[in-house]
Amino acid sequence: MNPMSWLIITTSIALSTTMITSTTHWLMTWACLEINTLSMVPLISKPNHPRATEAATKYYLIQTMASTSMLFAATTNALNTSNWETHLTTEPMATTIITLALMMKMAAAPFHSWLPSVSQGTTTLTTLTILTWQKIAPLTILLTTHNKTNITLILLSAMLSITMGGLGSLNQTQLRKLMAFSSIAHTGWIMATITMAPKISTLTFTIYIMTTIPTFLLINTTMSMTIKDLGTMWTNSPYTMTILSMTILSMGGLPPLSGFMPKWLILNNLISMNMITEATLMAMASLLSLYVYMRLTYMSSMTLSPHTTTMPLKWRTSNKKHPMGTSMLTMMTMLLLPLSPNM
């Protein structure tokens, strides 16, 4: 890609997301979302492969459909209330449509099926952008309108996202698809308390980004595409695989790693709100994802069953150095639990 085009696209993505966090007008919010979508399409289709083109088309159609629904709901609310302010959206039907549209943008269940195929069709770093940065804008809008959002709708989507994220990842061998289902499950945890305790949801999203970024950077460094590729890396770089294993366990929410903090706070908040059934179902559904993380850890840090290698092992011909930022993020994914806030 031309360096000037790359600069314009990345600047547009960064500025559109930043402007959404600071605007209070629905038309401005919609315009920023459209700029963000149009800027992501060239990045997704950059590999110049039929799968990348298919992924870019799917992403564009889903995001445009969600933005159009949100604009329709905002217009309906403006006709009935004579205001375009995001935090003054009072029409129940408009609020519900906006919530569903934002759930579609975040790939929350039941609107999650597009994310794995889009993630598999593009590069590892572009997938990282879709799973982290692209969730900031819809999450910001949800946080702005959280006091008007239907709590039942949010909780149902959260429980369904955690369940579908775990079930979908059970039979996956491709790492990008597996991480996409992991993102769907984490989206459920982020949304679980967004109406009752938005600060906990913000903390959950922050921890999610801190665990996802080093995982993707390490996968990109080793150029692993499947779970089998991870198993062949152990003899070449045991330090990298050890750090990757700990980061994956942190994503699973195992104590005493940092990933345990948000789940602990969310379950504690739900129980304090007398939502014991919902908390129990979410905790049980998260065991599906935990099984997948344990399988990944076993494959990446211990052993592979005897097999014939039918593809060239990439680590034989490449030796990449790990940037300092990756090391710092991996340490944060393991050591932040003692700093848990009292929420």
Swiss-Prot record:
- Indicate the transmembrane segments per the record: 1-21, 59-81, 96-116, 150-170, 178-198, 200-220, 241-261, 270-290
Class in the EC hierarchy, top level:
translocase
Main location class? mitochondrion
Report the membrane topology from the UniProt record: Multi-pass membrane protein
Location relative to the cell: Mitochondrion inner membrane
Q: What GO terms fall under cellular component here?
A: mitochondrial inner membrane
Supply the alphabetized keyword list. Electron transport, Membrane, Mitochondrion, Mitochondrion inner membrane, NAD, Respiratory chain, Translocase, Transmembrane, Transmembrane helix, Transport, Ubiquinone
Enzyme Commission designation: 7.1.1.2
Molecular function GO terms recorded: NADH dehydrogenase (ubiquinone) activity
Reactions accelerated catalytically: a ubiquinone + NADH + 5 H(+)(in) = a ubiquinol + NAD(+) + 4 H(+)(out)
Q: What does this protein do?
A: Core subunit of the mitochondrial membrane respiratory chain NADH dehydrogenase (Complex I) that is believed to belong to the minimal assembly required for catalysis. Complex I functions in the transfer of electrons from NADH to the respiratory chain. The immediate electron acceptor for the enzyme is believed to be ubiquinone.
Protein's name in the database: NADH-ubiquinone oxidoreductase chain 2
Its taxonomic path starts at: Eukaryota, Metazoa, Chordata, Craniata, Vertebrata
Gene encoding this chain?
MT-ND2
